[in-house]
């Protein structure tokens, strides 16, 4: 009787699990279950190491250089990401040169605003004793923005407008255009330990208004590589431009440091959650 009771209880337990869970893989007498209503958070940086992932929903919204530093450089552990939200009156208007098949370059009106800053991993340094260490930092467009020299020059005009009129700046100076990514050096005296060098990246949103551009997105992306223009909502196309900020800093290694954000996940999130960084309307 006891064996029959145990068998019935076991079957009832399995039935309950199958009501709440689904089998996602099975083999070698092992079943891997997943809750039927399970929905991974889109805002997670990645799903590899849940404990060290920062939820984008918890990111702060800032509008100044100091606020970026406060939440990323000065905080322990630092937030790996913040939204940047400027009033619509601060948006910079510019002209973007886009190449069209059989038409050549055309000037397209765009509005530009910084929309986020994220902490980028640069390199790790094990330090023995107390030394003045020469370390790396990056300047220019990050290596995720690969485009033609004409497009980079056109994009740079809008960026320079933001640099001269907003309280969020890159800290670097350029002559005519923002350069492709370059490695620079800087030094800091460090005590013995394991250190990680990080540097913030500013992400700028370039907004093309007008639903009339929607049919041409594929063509614009084909002949203007690197922009990855996407159509969002009914009235605008957007592409994002990442530019390194001159603020490399070191952190002594600690287990509770957040993982760096994954750029592709970040860009998708920014596109789908414009209310986090876009005030709406035009200047």
From Swiss-Prot:
Which terms in the GO cellular component ontology are assigned?
cytosol; phagocytic vesicle
Q: Does the keyword Transferase apply?
A: no
Question: Subcellular location, in the record's words?
Answer: Cytoplasm
Q: Which InterPro entries match?
A: BB_PF (IPR040927), SmlA (IPR038768)
Sorted alphabetically, the Gene Ontology BP terms of this entry are: DNA damage response; glucose 6-phosphate metabolic process; glucose homeostasis; positive regulation of aggregate size involved in sorocarp development; regulation of protein secretion; signal transduction
Which residues constitute the signal peptide according to the record? none
Principal localization? cytoplasm
Q: Which UniProt keywords apply?
A: Cytoplasm
Top-rank taxon: Eukaryota
The record ties this protein, via PANTHER family, to: MONALYSIN BETA BARREL PORE-FORMING DOMAIN-CONTAINING PROTEIN-RELATED (PTHR35884:SF1), SMALL AGGREGATE FORMATION PROTEIN (PTHR35884)
What is the protein's known function? Knockout of the gene for this protein causes small aggregate formation. May regulate the secretion or processing of a secreted factor that regulates aggregate size.
Protein name, UniProt field: Small aggregate formation protein
Query: Which organism was this protein described from?
Result: Dictyostelium discoideum (Social amoeba)
Gene assigned in the entry: smlA
